Amino acid sequence: MNKTEILLSCMFLNDSEEMIKRSHITSDTIIINQCDEDGYKEEHIGSAFVRTFSVKERGLTKSRNLAISESVADVCIICDDDEVFSQGYEEAVQKAYSSLPQADIIIFDMAGRPHKWGDSIKKLGYRDIMSVSSWQITFRREKLLAKGIRFDENMGAGSGNGAEEEFRFLTQCRKAGLKIYHYPYELATVAQTQSTWFKGFDREFFVNRGNTTRYIMGLPLSVLYAAYYAFAKRKQLTDISMFKAFSYTLAGIKENRLYKLNKGNN
């Protein structure tokens, strides 16, 4: 049986017991609490053995990576502080991995959100993973470690470079030969809380979008995607035109900030 562990990222957590109970967590959990002090504690909350790491550093992807490095599980479940897990989720995840021994990463459904692949078990390709959110992601930890894959710390909430860190993470997994599958089970419900990074479709959003898409896709595909994305979002744009959105995205593609950051860190 695959041992599972939830990797929960949060900020300024005061009561870990309340968090665990509110989220209906019943399995072992690592909490990365980004706050203003460093600390560590262990506690048993119901059936869950919970290890909480309090750290001063900021950034969602840094939180994810710390949790991965501290985990001792076979299978890890990515989690934020606004999720409520379905009853029996741990057994469902274990069943999914037992029935798909070839899967290195399994993407689950979220209650109240579109089920893109219906009730089918499906191996996911490049286009499929573009719409995956972090809450849906589970993975075999040892497979990730063996390939040296982590979340890109230049991306995600707190980085100043926008989001799409899940897409970057999954594309790196695919490039490394890891197999990604969808399994039809509603893992959790996600609250409709305000995003920590999305402030609307403004200039900053589209410039960041251009930077991230070029970083992940490369130059030719990112330009094509910029045109598609501006057109797809045209009805949601209130303060800028579709053509402005496209031009801002192109500005981000030209800036190529993330590539330069990554190159400077290596």
Where are these regions (language model features)?
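A recurrent flexible, glycine/aromatic-enriched loop bordering the glycosyltransferase active site
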Residues: 122-143, 160-162
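Active-site donor/metal-binding and catalytic loop motifs
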Residues: 157-161, 179-200, 209-212
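Glycine-rich, basic loop-to-helix element that forms the pyrophosphate-binding segment
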Residues: 54-71
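A short, conserved alpha-helix in the catalytic core of glycosyltransferases
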Residues: 143, 154-183
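Conserved donor NDP-sugar-binding/catalytic core segment of glycosyltransferases
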Residues: 84, 88-121
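N-proximal low-complexity "stem/linker" segments adjacent to membrane-targeting elements
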Residues: 1-28
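Short aromatic/hydrophobic "clamp" motif used to bind/position activated sugar donors
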Residues: 76
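Non-catalytic, C-terminal membrane-associated alpha-helical segments of glycosyltransferases
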Residues: 200-266
